[in-house]
Structures are given as structure tokens and as C-alpha cells.
Amino acid sequence: ALWRWSTTELDAFWQSIWNYFDLQSPTPHQAALVKNAMPGGQWFTGAQANYAQQVFRHADAAHAAGFPAIISENEKGLHRELSWPELKRQAASLALHLQAQGLQPGDRVAAYLPNIPEAMVAFLAVVSVGGVWSICAPDMGTNAVLDRFAQIEPKILIACDGVSYGGRDHDRLQVVADMRAALPSVQHLILLRNLDDQASLPDSTDFADTIARNDAATQSFEPMWLDFNHPLWIVYSSGTTGLPKPIVHGHGGTLIVALALKVLHNDIGCSYHPNTFGERYHWYSSTGWVMWNAQLSGLLNGTTCVIYDGNPGGSKDKPDWTTLWRFAANNGVTFFGAGAAFFANCLKANIDLSGLTGLQSVRALGTTGSPLSEDAQRWGTQQFERLGTPNIWWCNISGGTDFAGAFIGGNRELPLVPGEMQCRLLGCAVEAWNEQGQPVLGDVGELVCAQPLPSMPLYFWGDKDNARYLSSYFDMYPAGHGRQPGGGDGPAS
């Protein structure tokens, strides 16, 4: 009944989510859903938002409770913790630097960074002053990155000199130099020395210098209020059918959907709230996967984000699928997420977690990216039973880059069936449709969302008249319904 209400009374449901999370805006909004249309739904007209503002409103309370904002490690064993005040100060310092370089609201900032705290700092700095964020992982080569960044014409490029992965260092200075040469829109390059303290490129600024400021301006800095639908970030489709689609999501829609998913369905509370055990959220991802964006959402309500940069399976010479588990055990992770393939590899390697007593902090396991097999789920459940955690909860989700969220996910109140997902998410009118556009149960169909969501793409960057957007999502069926491309065919139940 609750799900049906949430998908038939969209205005009332999303207003209740706004109220539940006490979302802030200096200006009032007309209604949650002003125009119910697909495409073209209009949400919270009149409201203002800023993703970074929602993050930092929890900084003081989380810090006072003694919890860090970010805990990170890499495969070389470098352990770092970033406090909430330091996260805010560094983001403010970089934001002021970006403004001094001429960054205006709506300008794009491209990042070529690994999954380290500096990437989160850079994101918060960019969006706090209205810049539009876009990131590619450093495991991508020049051509793949340019296929994405050339479409959005970034004004500023933030890039690293290289990364460590699989037991080896991978220099990326030449890739960065080639990118800058091929992107005439770039007016300023910020170089993060991730491998070599002496790395440099001509006419670049050291990232460390941009986050070093600590004065009255950084102390008083606050993210600017933006229109609810101001562009937040640009993410990309896989590019298997042409150039990757540059998908634009807005501040307000992204943060409200992320909060509903993370708190109501993933059951991830805030670090400083009573009875949430000092919540520590980890979802293994590179910065090139939308799950990095999902990991970021932990900051939206004061959760500690616990991130790992490196190969989860060790190296080619020394494979070790206990790497991430040891990382989680050593850092008190409470929610441990990864792609379903990770759990399949752990099963295949026949690893034993019984000696990692620190894993008793974990109270939930999350999976996505591909179907999780029954055998892999049973393996994980048995491992945690041996650790003294019977019936560990699995939060298996199906989502998409396209709408920065999930359609199907977890519910602690429902039974677990190995290899299956528990429920359709609140607010997501998800069905399986046959070729005639009719809903089907127990049969193969296309995964369809038949009602609008606040986090639907605003548009594709540079897509004149929304032609590419419409053909991607709204050509298959009549009556203006959209489907998640790449959602896969599967039996509906």
C-alpha cells in the first residue's frame, strides 16, 4: 500500500520526503510536482538547493560526535582520515581559487582523478559555487576521456599525475598533457601529485596549493543557493552505440532521491545520530562508475564515507580477494557494498573470512552492477554466520547512471531470497512491459519506469531540441513512458 501510494500520489510522497529530511531552501516552492509529465516533469518549482550545502549542514554535529567525514586507504597502505571541518575548509579554499580563475555558475569542470579524498573535496568545491562537475577515472586512456570531455567543453581541468593499481604505478602525465592540448576550452589546469611529489606540467597549479588557504574567507564560506534544477554533474553512458551520452542531473532532484534511497532503502543512517553505531559507508567503485556518485551521497546526511583506491583482488602476481574485507574490518565499515562480480570472485577464490573479527561491524552487504548468484549470496551469508552475524542483510539493487538512482532495492522488513532483490523502491513506478507496452508478471519484459522521478536527466549536454534524449528513452513505447536503457530483460515478479 505504501509503494502504491508513493507512485500514484507523487506530489504528496516527494513532499513527505522533503519534510522528513528537513530539506532547506531560502525560497518557497509551489508544490513537489508542479507538472506531471514524462519527459518534462517539473519538481519543486521556486525552491533552491545546493548539494554541498546539504553535506555541510551536518558537519558540526558529526564532528562534535567524534566521527570523520572520510576515511581512505590505497593499496600501498596509506591510511588517511579527513575531519568534517577540514573537508569544509579544503572545499572552501579550492572553491575560492576556482572563482578567482573565473569559474562562473554553469561552467564545466572536468576531473581525471582516482577514488581518493581529493576527488570528493574537488567535487564539493566545484558544485558549491555552481560549477558543473564531470569526472573520468585515470584507468581510461586519452581517446576515451576526450570522447566524453570534448562534448562538454570544460573551463577547468583537475587531473592527477598517475595512479597505483594492481601492484604497479601507472604514470598519466602524458595523458593529461594530451587532454589539455585537445581541449581548447580549458583555461586552467590543476595538477594533483598522486604518485610523484615532483611531478609537474607547464602552466599548471599544484592541487595542494589550492586547498591550503585558511583565513577569514574560508571560514565564512558557504555554498551558494542555486535553482533546484541547476546542473550538478554530467555522467556518461557506456558509448557502445556511438559517442557516450553526456547525461545532466540537477542539484535538488539528485540529492532528494539519493537521500530516500540511502536512508529508507539502504538503511544507512548518519554517523552522529543515536543507535546508528557510528555509521561507516563503503561501496567499492572507481570514479568512472556511478557508484562513486552513490558513495558521495553518504555525506548528504552525515555518514562517514570509507573509500578504497586500488585493485580489490590484489595484484596479478599476488591475487588476494580478502583485500577489501581486511580494509573493511580495519576501518569499522557498517555497510559494505561492491559489484556482484566481486562477491562471485570471492566465492571462486574460496576465501575464508572467519579470522577477520573486525568484520563484525558490518551489518549490511550491498550489491549491484550485475545479477548476484544464489551461490555467491549464500557464501557471504555463511561467512558472516561464522563471524557471529547470523542472517546478514543483503541490499541488492538495480539502478542506472541515467537517473542517478535505483529502481529496485532493499527493505529490512521483507524476507531475503538468495539471488533476488526485495522490492520496488518508493516513488519508482517500475514495471516490466512486453513489446505491446503492456505490464507483465512472471514473464520477460523491458524494465520501465512509468511515472517521473526528481532525478531524471535534465537533458543531455549539447543535445539540440532534446532529440538524442527523446530517442534514448521515449521512442520504444507510446504515451510518453520512459524505460531504463540497458536495464536488461528478465522475469518480473
Report the location of each language-model feature:
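Adenylate-forming
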Residues: 114, 156-175, 308-312, 331-379, ...
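Conserved AMP-binding A3 loop
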Residues: 80-85, 223-226, 232-256
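Short beta-strand->loop structural element characteristic of the AMP-binding/adenylate-forming
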Residues: 110-113, 119, 123, 127-179, ...
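Conserved AMP-binding/adenylate-forming
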Residues: 363-365, 372-493
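AMP-dependent adenylate-forming
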Residues: 31-32, 55-83, 193-199
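Conserved AMP-binding/adenylation subdomain of ANL enzymes
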Residues: 253-280, 288-334, 349-350
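ANL superfamily adenylate-forming
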Residues: 76, 159-228, 349-351
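Conserved AMP-binding/adenylate-forming core of the ANL superfamily
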Residues: 4, 52, 66, 70-124, ...
